[in-house]
């Protein structure tokens, strides 16, 4: 089972259906409706942290969950706010983007590794965010896995765990 943390965003249900289409059993839990021990006791194959409004510091258990996934070596994918929560949990800074992107399509350039394996190096994706991971504060345990043509971080990957984040959706 995959546990999908809902940060009160309707895109959570798109992720739910995408994962289901891939044959995964998915349980959706709101970011303020469970504690970490309850989630770990469910013995999931992995977690997905959804997009949502606001900043990682106000995303319920999302940041704490990132640290638990690192400690327990549980796979994790963070999308948008979930991506930011990964960097924030490791003491990275989340800042206002130079330009706000809500429903804008941009070219994404990947490293073709991890979740980007078997995908084109470059592809178009839609962006819905006004916050980004600050490059200068990127924690040492994370590497950049994707960027825009302008260099904005669009993907991060933990160097020692199966933990990835994508800013776009």
Question: Model-flagged regions — what are they?
Answer:
Residues 1-3:
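Extreme N-terminal starter segment of soluble prokaryotic enzymes
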Residues 112-160:
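Catalytic beta-strand/loop cores that center a nucleophilic Ser/Cys/Thr
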Residues 42-118, 122-124:
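Cysteine-nucleophile active-site neighborhood
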Residues 34-43:
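Short amphipathic alpha-helix with an adjacent loop that forms part of the alpha/beta core around
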Residues 16-25:
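Two-component/phosphorelay signaling modules centered on CheY-like receiver
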Residues 12:
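Active-site-adjacent helical/loop segments in soluble small-molecule enzymes
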Residues 25-31:
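Short hydrophobic/Thr-rich beta-strand motif most characteristic of the beta2 strand and flanking loop
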Residues 166-168:
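Phosphate-binding/catalytic loops
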């Amino acid at each position: 089972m995959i546990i999908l943390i809902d940060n009160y965003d309707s895109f959570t249900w798109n992720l739910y259906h995408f994962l289901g289409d891939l044959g995964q059993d998915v349980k959706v839990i709101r970011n303020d409706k469970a504690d970490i021990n309850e989630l770990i006791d469910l013995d999931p194959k992995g977690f997905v942290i959804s997009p949502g409004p606001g900043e990682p510091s106000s995303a319920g258990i999302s940041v704490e969950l990132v640290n638990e996934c690192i400690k327990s070596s549980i796979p994790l994918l963070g999308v948008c706010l979930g991506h930011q929560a990964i960097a924030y949990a490791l003491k990275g800074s989340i800042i206002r983007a130079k330009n706000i992107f809500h429903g804008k399509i941009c070219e994404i350039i990947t490293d073709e590794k991890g979740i980007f394996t078997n995908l084109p190096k470059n592809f178009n994706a839609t962006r819905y965010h006004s916050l980004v991971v600050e490059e200068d504060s990127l924690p040492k345990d994370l590497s950049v896995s994707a960027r825009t043509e302008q260099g904005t971080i669009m993907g991060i990957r933990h160097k020692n765990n199966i933990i990835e984040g994508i800013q776009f959706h």
